Amino acid sequence: MTGTRTFFVGGNHKMNGSKSMLESLSKGMNESVENKENVDIFIAPSYPYLEFLSNKLDNKKFKVCSQNCYSVAKGAFTGEISANMLVDLGIPYVIIGHSERRNVFSESSELITKKTKYAISLGLTVILCLGELLADRKSNNTEHILSEQLKDFASFTPEEWSKIVIAYEPVWAIGTGAVATPQEAQDTHVFIRKWISEKVSEDVAKKTSIMYGGSVNADNCHNLSKQSDIDGFLVGGASLVASDFIAIIKSAVPKKY
Protein backbone atom coordinates (compact mmCIF):
# COMPACT_ATOMS: atom_id res chain seq x y z
CA MET A 1 0.00 0.00 0.00
CA THR A 2 1.24 3.48 -0.81
CA GLY A 3 0.97 6.43 1.50
CA THR A 4 -1.74 7.93 -0.73
CA ARG A 5 -4.35 5.27 0.06
CA THR A 6 -6.54 4.91 3.12
CA PHE A 7 -6.77 1.50 4.81
CA PHE A 8 -10.39 0.50 5.54
CA VAL A 9 -11.88 -2.04 7.92
CA GLY A 10 -15.64 -2.33 7.57
CA GLY A 11 -18.27 -4.52 9.19
CA ASN A 12 -21.35 -5.49 7.16
CA HIS A 13 -24.05 -6.76 9.51
CA LYS A 14 -26.46 -7.70 6.70
CA MET A 15 -29.91 -8.59 8.16
CA ASN A 16 -28.61 -9.23 11.67
CA GLY A 17 -28.37 -7.40 14.95
CA SER A 18 -30.40 -5.82 17.73
CA LYS A 19 -30.17 -2.72 19.89
CA SER A 20 -28.60 -4.68 22.73
CA MET A 21 -26.01 -6.24 20.41
CA LEU A 22 -25.11 -2.86 18.93
CA GLU A 23 -24.88 -1.36 22.41
CA SER A 24 -22.34 -4.03 23.36
CA LEU A 25 -20.46 -3.71 20.08
CA SER A 26 -20.15 0.07 20.24
CA LYS A 27 -19.08 -0.01 23.89
CA GLY A 28 -16.34 -2.53 23.13
CA MET A 29 -15.10 -0.63 20.10
CA ASN A 30 -15.17 2.77 21.78
CA GLU A 31 -13.07 1.45 24.65
CA SER A 32 -10.63 -0.78 22.76
CA VAL A 33 -9.82 0.80 19.39
CA GLU A 34 -7.59 3.84 19.00
CA ASN A 35 -7.52 6.41 16.22
CA LYS A 36 -4.88 5.79 13.59
CA GLU A 37 -3.98 8.12 10.75
CA ASN A 38 -4.96 6.87 7.28
CA VAL A 39 -7.27 4.18 8.71
CA ASP A 40 -11.07 4.34 8.41
CA ILE A 41 -13.26 1.92 10.37
CA PHE A 42 -16.98 1.64 9.66
CA ILE A 43 -20.00 -0.47 10.57
CA ALA A 44 -22.99 -1.10 8.29
CA PRO A 45 -25.94 -2.13 10.50
CA SER A 46 -29.42 -2.99 9.30
CA TYR A 47 -31.38 0.11 8.25
CA PRO A 48 -33.50 0.56 11.42
CA TYR A 49 -30.33 0.89 13.50
CA LEU A 50 -28.39 3.46 11.45
CA GLU A 51 -29.17 6.44 13.67
CA PHE A 52 -29.06 4.37 16.87
CA LEU A 53 -25.55 3.13 16.11
CA SER A 54 -24.42 6.57 14.98
CA ASN A 55 -25.38 7.91 18.39
CA LYS A 56 -23.55 5.11 20.20
CA LEU A 57 -20.24 4.94 18.33
CA ASP A 58 -17.44 7.42 18.92
CA ASN A 59 -17.76 9.41 15.69
CA LYS A 60 -14.18 10.61 15.96
CA LYS A 61 -12.99 7.01 15.58
CA PHE A 62 -15.67 5.29 13.52
CA LYS A 63 -18.13 5.87 10.70
CA VAL A 64 -21.57 4.38 10.14
CA CYS A 65 -22.39 2.99 6.70
CA SER A 66 -25.64 2.04 4.97
CA GLN A 67 -25.92 -1.35 3.29
CA ASN A 68 -27.64 0.05 0.20
CA CYS A 69 -29.54 2.99 -1.29
CA TYR A 70 -31.60 3.67 -4.40
CA SER A 71 -30.83 5.77 -7.47
CA VAL A 72 -33.32 8.62 -7.02
CA ALA A 73 -34.21 11.06 -4.25
CA LYS A 74 -37.76 9.95 -3.44
CA GLY A 75 -40.88 8.36 -4.83
CA ALA A 76 -43.08 5.27 -4.93
CA PHE A 77 -40.33 2.73 -4.26
CA THR A 78 -41.64 0.69 -1.35
CA GLY A 79 -38.92 -0.71 0.87
CA GLU A 80 -36.12 1.43 -0.57
CA ILE A 81 -34.12 4.22 1.02
CA SER A 82 -32.47 7.13 -0.77
CA ALA A 83 -29.03 8.65 -0.58
CA ASN A 84 -30.79 11.88 0.42
CA MET A 85 -32.13 10.16 3.53
CA LEU A 86 -28.64 8.96 4.42
CA VAL A 87 -27.29 12.49 4.07
CA ASP A 88 -30.16 13.74 6.25
CA LEU A 89 -29.13 11.22 8.94
CA GLY A 90 -25.46 12.17 8.66
CA ILE A 91 -24.44 8.74 7.32
CA PRO A 92 -21.27 9.22 5.21
CA TYR A 93 -20.80 5.76 3.61
CA VAL A 94 -22.96 3.37 1.62
CA ILE A 95 -22.32 -0.14 0.28
CA ILE A 96 -23.50 -0.61 -3.30
CA GLY A 97 -23.37 -3.69 -5.52
CA HIS A 98 -22.91 -6.35 -2.85
CA SER A 99 -23.15 -9.85 -4.32
CA GLU A 100 -26.33 -10.49 -2.35
CA ARG A 101 -27.91 -7.46 -4.03
CA ARG A 102 -26.70 -8.66 -7.42
CA ASN A 103 -27.54 -12.35 -7.03
CA VAL A 104 -30.45 -12.52 -4.56
CA PHE A 105 -32.24 -9.31 -5.59
CA SER A 106 -31.17 -9.38 -9.26
CA GLU A 107 -29.67 -5.90 -9.32
CA SER A 108 -28.03 -5.23 -12.67
CA SER A 109 -24.68 -3.57 -13.24
CA GLU A 110 -26.59 -0.72 -14.93
CA LEU A 111 -28.65 -0.07 -11.79
CA ILE A 112 -25.57 -0.34 -9.57
CA THR A 113 -23.83 2.28 -11.71
CA LYS A 114 -26.82 4.63 -11.46
CA LYS A 115 -27.02 4.19 -7.69
CA THR A 116 -23.31 4.84 -7.32
CA LYS A 117 -23.35 7.99 -9.45
CA TYR A 118 -26.33 9.40 -7.56
CA ALA A 119 -24.88 8.64 -4.12
CA ILE A 120 -21.57 10.25 -5.09
CA SER A 121 -23.37 13.35 -6.39
CA LEU A 122 -24.67 13.90 -2.84
CA GLY A 123 -21.22 13.53 -1.31
CA LEU A 124 -21.47 9.96 -0.02
CA THR A 125 -18.49 7.62 -0.15
CA VAL A 126 -19.47 4.41 -1.96
CA ILE A 127 -18.10 1.00 -1.03
CA LEU A 128 -18.47 -0.58 -4.48
CA CYS A 129 -18.54 -4.39 -4.32
CA LEU A 130 -17.24 -6.67 -7.07
CA GLY A 131 -16.81 -10.41 -7.19
CA GLU A 132 -17.09 -13.64 -9.13
CA LEU A 133 -18.90 -16.93 -8.53
CA LEU A 134 -17.03 -20.19 -7.89
CA ALA A 135 -17.85 -21.39 -11.41
CA ASP A 136 -16.25 -18.23 -12.80
CA ARG A 137 -13.10 -18.78 -10.75
CA LYS A 138 -12.84 -22.44 -11.80
CA SER A 139 -13.28 -21.55 -15.48
CA ASN A 140 -10.65 -18.78 -15.27
CA ASN A 141 -13.37 -16.23 -15.98
CA THR A 142 -12.72 -13.95 -13.01
CA GLU A 143 -11.13 -11.11 -14.95
CA HIS A 144 -13.94 -11.07 -17.53
CA ILE A 145 -16.61 -10.92 -14.82
CA LEU A 146 -14.85 -8.10 -12.97
CA SER A 147 -14.35 -6.17 -16.21
CA GLU A 148 -18.07 -6.45 -16.95
CA GLN A 149 -18.95 -5.23 -13.45
CA LEU A 150 -16.55 -2.30 -13.82
CA LYS A 151 -17.07 -1.27 -17.44
CA ASP A 152 -19.68 1.46 -16.83
CA PHE A 153 -17.36 3.14 -14.33
CA ALA A 154 -14.79 3.90 -17.03
CA SER A 155 -16.75 7.08 -17.77
CA PHE A 156 -16.64 8.31 -14.16
CA THR A 157 -14.45 11.35 -13.57
CA PRO A 158 -11.43 11.33 -11.25
CA GLU A 159 -13.50 13.44 -8.85
CA GLU A 160 -16.20 10.76 -8.81
CA TRP A 161 -13.61 8.03 -8.36
CA SER A 162 -12.25 9.87 -5.33
CA LYS A 163 -15.52 8.92 -3.59
CA ILE A 164 -15.29 5.21 -4.49
CA VAL A 165 -13.70 2.45 -2.43
CA ILE A 166 -13.62 -0.95 -4.16
CA ALA A 167 -14.47 -4.06 -2.14
CA TYR A 168 -13.45 -7.25 -3.93
CA GLU A 169 -15.51 -10.13 -2.53
CA PRO A 170 -15.21 -13.49 -4.26
CA VAL A 171 -18.77 -14.79 -3.91
CA TRP A 172 -17.55 -18.33 -3.26
CA ALA A 173 -15.76 -17.13 -0.12
CA ILE A 174 -18.60 -15.13 1.47
CA GLY A 175 -19.84 -16.88 4.61
CA THR A 176 -18.43 -20.23 3.52
CA GLY A 177 -15.25 -20.36 5.56
CA ALA A 178 -13.30 -20.52 2.30
CA VAL A 179 -10.94 -17.64 1.68
CA ALA A 180 -8.76 -16.63 -1.24
CA THR A 181 -5.09 -17.22 -0.62
CA PRO A 182 -3.07 -14.03 -0.09
CA GLN A 183 -1.57 -14.46 -3.56
CA GLU A 184 -4.97 -15.07 -5.21
CA ALA A 185 -6.38 -11.96 -3.55
CA GLN A 186 -3.31 -9.89 -4.42
CA ASP A 187 -3.39 -10.99 -8.06
CA THR A 188 -7.05 -10.03 -8.38
CA HIS A 189 -6.49 -6.67 -6.71
CA VAL A 190 -3.61 -6.04 -9.11
CA PHE A 191 -5.96 -6.78 -12.02
CA ILE A 192 -8.58 -4.35 -10.69
CA ARG A 193 -5.97 -1.63 -10.19
CA LYS A 194 -4.59 -2.24 -13.68
CA TRP A 195 -8.11 -1.95 -15.13
CA ILE A 196 -8.60 1.40 -13.38
CA SER A 197 -5.19 2.58 -14.61
CA GLU A 198 -5.98 1.68 -18.22
CA LYS A 199 -9.64 2.75 -18.33
CA VAL A 200 -9.62 5.79 -16.02
CA SER A 201 -6.11 6.97 -15.14
CA GLU A 202 -2.92 5.81 -13.49
CA ASP A 203 -3.32 8.47 -10.80
CA VAL A 204 -6.83 7.27 -9.90
CA ALA A 205 -5.58 3.68 -9.80
CA LYS A 206 -2.83 4.59 -7.36
CA LYS A 207 -5.24 6.47 -5.08
CA THR A 208 -8.20 4.04 -5.07
CA SER A 209 -8.37 1.78 -2.02
CA ILE A 210 -9.30 -1.85 -2.75
CA MET A 211 -10.63 -3.87 0.19
CA TYR A 212 -10.91 -7.66 0.37
CA GLY A 213 -13.96 -9.48 1.72
CA GLY A 214 -14.94 -13.11 2.11
CA SER A 215 -14.73 -15.10 5.36
CA VAL A 216 -12.21 -12.64 6.84
CA ASN A 217 -11.16 -13.33 10.43
CA ALA A 218 -8.36 -12.36 12.82
CA ASP A 219 -6.24 -15.32 11.72
CA ASN A 220 -6.32 -15.00 7.94
CA CYS A 221 -6.19 -11.19 7.77
CA HIS A 222 -2.58 -11.30 9.07
CA ASN A 223 -1.14 -12.49 5.78
CA LEU A 224 -3.75 -10.89 3.55
CA SER A 225 -2.96 -7.44 4.92
CA LYS A 226 0.72 -7.83 4.02
CA GLN A 227 -0.14 -7.76 0.32
CA SER A 228 0.70 -4.42 -1.28
CA ASP A 229 -2.60 -3.99 -3.13
CA ILE A 230 -4.94 -5.04 -0.31
CA ASP A 231 -6.11 -1.84 1.36
CA GLY A 232 -8.48 -3.21 3.97
CA PHE A 233 -11.24 -5.69 4.72
CA LEU A 234 -15.01 -5.86 4.45
CA VAL A 235 -16.01 -8.22 7.25
CA GLY A 236 -19.29 -10.10 7.57
CA GLY A 237 -20.15 -12.43 10.45
CA ALA A 238 -17.01 -11.63 12.43
CA SER A 239 -18.12 -8.00 12.73
CA LEU A 240 -21.18 -8.91 14.82
CA VAL A 241 -19.17 -9.57 17.98
CA ALA A 242 -17.02 -6.80 19.42
CA SER A 243 -14.11 -9.03 20.43
CA ASP A 244 -13.95 -10.68 16.98
CA PHE A 245 -14.12 -7.43 15.04
CA ILE A 246 -11.63 -5.68 17.33
CA ALA A 247 -9.25 -8.63 16.88
CA ILE A 248 -9.41 -8.17 13.10
CA ILE A 249 -8.75 -4.43 13.39
CA LYS A 250 -5.80 -4.96 15.71
CA SER A 251 -4.45 -7.83 13.64
CA ALA A 252 -4.73 -6.20 10.21
CA VAL A 253 -3.85 -2.56 10.75
CA PRO A 254 -0.36 -2.99 12.29
CA LYS A 255 0.71 -5.12 9.33
CA LYS A 256 0.34 -2.09 7.10
CA TYR A 257 2.11 0.48 9.24
Curated annotation (Swiss-Prot):
Q: Which Pfam families match?
A: TIM (PF00121)
Name the pathway it acts in: Carbohydrate biosynthesis; gluconeogenesis; Carbohydrate degradation; glycolysis; D-glyceraldehyde 3-phosphate from glycerone phosphate: step 1/1
What cellular component GO annotations does this protein have?
Answer: cytosol
Q: Report the EC code(s) recorded for this entry.
A: 5.3.1.1
| Transmembrane region(s) | none
Q: Which Gene3D superfamilies match?
A: Aldolase class I
Any one GO MF term held by the record is: triose-phosphate isomerase activity
User: Which reactions does this protein catalyse?
Assistant: D-glyceraldehyde 3-phosphate = dihydroxyacetone phosphate
Binding-site residues, substrate: N12, K14
**Active-site residues, Swiss-Prot/TrEMBL:** H98, E169
Q: What class of enzyme is it?
A: isomerase
**Biological process GO annotation list?**
gluconeogenesis; glyceraldehyde-3-phosphate biosynthetic process; glycerol catabolic process; glycolytic process
Task: Give the UniProt keywords, A-Z.
Answer: Gluconeogenesis, Glycolysis, Isomerase
Q: How does it assemble?
A: Homodimer.
The record's comment on protein family reads: Belongs to the triosephosphate isomerase family.
Q: What is this protein called?
A: Triosephosphate isomerase
Originating species: Dictyostelium discoideum
